[in-house]
Amino acid sequence: MTDQPVSEPSTDMPDMTDMPALPTLPSEPRPRSARTSTLLALLVVFVLGGGALFVSGFTLGRLAGATPGTTDANQDLFRPFWDAYTDVSQNYVGEVDPHFLVEGAIKGIFNALGDPFSQYLTEEEYRASLGGISGEFEGVGLEMATQDAAGQPCDAISDTCRLRVTHVVRRSPALAAGMQNGDVVSAVDGAAIIGKTIDDVITLIRGPKGTVVTLTVVRAGSTMDVPITRDVIQREDVTSQVLADGKIGYLKIDGFSSGSAQDLHDLLTELVQTNHVQGLILDLRDDPGGYVDAAQKIASEFTSADPLYWEQTATGAPEPQHPSPGGAATDTNIPMVVLVNGGTASASEIVSAALQGNQRALLIGSRTYGKGTIQEFKELPGAGGYRLSVRKWLTPDQTWIHGVGLFPNINIEPPADQQQPNDAVLDKGIQVVLAELAGTPVVTDPPPTHSPQPTLSPVPSA
């Protein structure tokens, strides 16, 4: 909940005909749902660091129906809540929907945590979130991030924290409408988005197939309105190509949806067994994450080192997460690098950490987002659902990177011009892989002498 300003009582009696009408709280009962969720493991970045739905690990589960115990301690703890609820529901001069009050109380629980990755979701937001994770949803086909002038993640949209397009999905309505990487979105359907979070804006942009949303876009100093007709978006998370005269296989992952691991396995197998590439580049830049089991399977395609990473609950010891058998490129004679930046978050950081920490690949680019928690996604029947941070994930040497990120072995800061055609990071990746194939030593940057300590206080939501 947000604090509302409180005005001092007036000593003058105003003319009642000039008084504004009392706000009416929603009074229509909300439909109940009998949906039952199955247990899944997911990792998503809600836009993820700067946005992009970035980054969070999730477990989707079913509420067991248990309620807090009725001990004297709990009764004392909840007495102020029930006193306030009873007083409002019985004595508030306007109309009151008890479901609306309960929803507000649930929101308050999650807001009190101060964790942007733990959040109450309305039924619409809950469905949209799960659709985005699965790889299919109705929208326009944009991935975005909130970034400051230096390209670093930031929180709520402001004059110094702008909502920037980081990826336009192939064959999407946004691409057909002319949207480009680097575009800055300043308004949706004519309404400015200053003060909103990236999740707020994504909710505004998504909508039923066939409807139109108009984005106000700033590009190269010019402002324009771009109408886009929404459609079903099929995310194509994994693409590949052959570089350097057939010597290097390049794989780009834009997100970790339910089919990403199999898609990557198929493309990687083709690169290694059909194209006979000798080295690999895995591009995880601006990848906000997705399913956590996809991250485990994708890391297993490149290394059989054990453990890949660790998971830890609030009260338990770290538990190792093991590789799956049958990886298509676990042969360490195939050199590889991973390209990363500040938009590399959550599931993509798990893969990056597994490959860097097990000495399978060098990281090239800039420091990653720093999303080190895993969320549990649960449905509240008839009342939406929520995501709650329930576990940490740790690198192979049990380092927690939350709010800190992974530091690349070779640091290359992103260009100020997000739309410039030259890709210095990819060029460096090609250079490093070719050097390793030739047996030439590769010079890496020294590790940082000091880095911020991980914390569960709010980090920029993505």
Describe the residue ranges of each PLM region:
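PDZ/PDZ-like domain segments forming the peptide/carboxylate-binding groove
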Residues: 91, 135-187, 191-195, 258, ...
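Terminal targeting/pro-maturation regions of precursor/exported proteins
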Residues: 2-119, 459-461
